[in-house]
């Protein structure tokens, strides 16, 4: 934060650009299904929305970036006025504050960074097709959903659990165990500050099409929209959410540990001690509230549907999908 810019030479910048481009090739371009999330977010969010691309960026933008742009970006965002620090563990609070002052006290605060407000919505269904170097076709379904910590965020998180967590979950039992038309299925509430998205991902078993998978997913979501989960399903999902919450707090550092949670609550909510309220979001849900949020958000005509199929096997995709090129 304090000493990067004086050490950032053109040669070092060019070197790091190649490192990132190589990382992009390894983790996205050359990985099976690796470009699917890029295609999904580009369809969900408008081009000027910060979530319409992944953090790694596009290869064209990386190659076109300049040292001056990097300096301007760093000066705008990487300074104490836009930073938060959390220290957790067996420490002396006074000593910790003194050390923070010693290491960061002389760093200029920098300009204030105001909150970003970006709206995103789908006016209708979007059907995309991506041919990839894969053996089995895979279906990606995505909907806009409530932002992180917003009303409904916890409900959608629990719905994902009801749908795909465990062998008795609705979609696993129907797609993988009973009908055997899929090899794997997962659902997530991707919670984000400016707006989340709910996602279902299903990989077809050999000999089956993505239309077969889509029909079952739509059927199960319609069932949840009509009646919600059962009391037993809700109880199991709540127990799992509570167990995960407690498990994360057993670790002081790392992603999801005490220090990470303190910092997240401070940055996103202004309340570092939000632990009890965070857990209460889940404990206060009900069968009816989950049903209502499925009805409101998991709507077929406001959904991105991405078919990823083996090259030359476009017949396995959802009918009417348009080819998409991810750069």
Language-model features and meaning:
Residues 153-154:
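Zinc-dependent metallopeptidase catalytic helix centered on the HExxH motif
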Residues 27-82, 102, 106-150, 161-212, ...:
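Non-catalytic beta-strand/loop surface segments
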Residues 90-94, 206-209:
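Helix N-cap motif at beta-to-alpha junctions
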Residues 1-2, 98-104, 213-219:
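Short amphipathic alpha-helices in soluble, non-transmembrane regions
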Residues 3-11, 27, 226-229:
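Short, polar/flexible loop-turn hinges at active-site or ligand-entry regions and domain interfaces
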Residues 7-10, 93-94, 104-110:
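Bacterial peptidoglycan biogenesis and beta-lactam-recognition machinery
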């Amino acid at each position: 934060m304090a000493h990067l810019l004086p050490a950032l030479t053109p040669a070092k910048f060019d070197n790091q650009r190649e490192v990132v481009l190589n990382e992009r090739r390894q983790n996205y371009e050359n990985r099976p299904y690796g470009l699917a999330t890029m295609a999904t977010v580009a369809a969900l969010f408008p081009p000027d929305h910060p979530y319409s691309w992944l953090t790694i960026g596009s290869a064209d933008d990386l190659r076109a970036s300049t040292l001056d742009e990097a300096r301007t970006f760093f000066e705008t965002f990487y300074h104490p006025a836009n930073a938060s620090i959390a220290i957790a563990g067996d420490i002396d609070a006074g000593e910790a504050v003194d050390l923070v002052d010693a290491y960061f006290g002389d760093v200029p605060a920098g300009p204030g960074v105001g909150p970003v407000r970006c709206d995103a919505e789908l006016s209708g269904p979007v059907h995309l097709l991506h041919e990839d170097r894969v053996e089995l076709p895979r279906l990606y379904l995505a909907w806009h959903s409530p932002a992180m910590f917003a009303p409904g965020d916890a409900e959608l998180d629990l719905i994902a659990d009801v749908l795909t967590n465990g062998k008795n979950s609705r979609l696993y039992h129907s797609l993988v165990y009973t009908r055997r038309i899929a090899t794997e299925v997962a659902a997530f509430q991707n919670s984000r500050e400016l707006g989340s998205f709910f996602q279902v991902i299903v990989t077809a078993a050999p000999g089956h099409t993505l239309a077969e998978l889509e029909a079952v997913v739509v059927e199960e979501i319609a069932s949840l929209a009509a009646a919600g989960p059962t009391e037993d399903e809700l109880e199991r999902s709540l127990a799992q959410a509570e167990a995960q919450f407690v498990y994360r707090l057993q670790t002081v550092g790392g992603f999801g540990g005490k220090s990470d949670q303190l910092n997240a609550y401070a940055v996103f909510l202004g309340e570092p001690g939000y632990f009890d309220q965070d857990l209460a979001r889940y404990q206060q849900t009900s069968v009816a509230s989950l049903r209502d949020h499925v009805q409101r958000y998991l709507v077929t005509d406001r959904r991105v549907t991405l078919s990823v199929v083996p090259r030359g096997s476009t017949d396995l995709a959802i009918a009417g999908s348009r080819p998409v090129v991810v750069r």
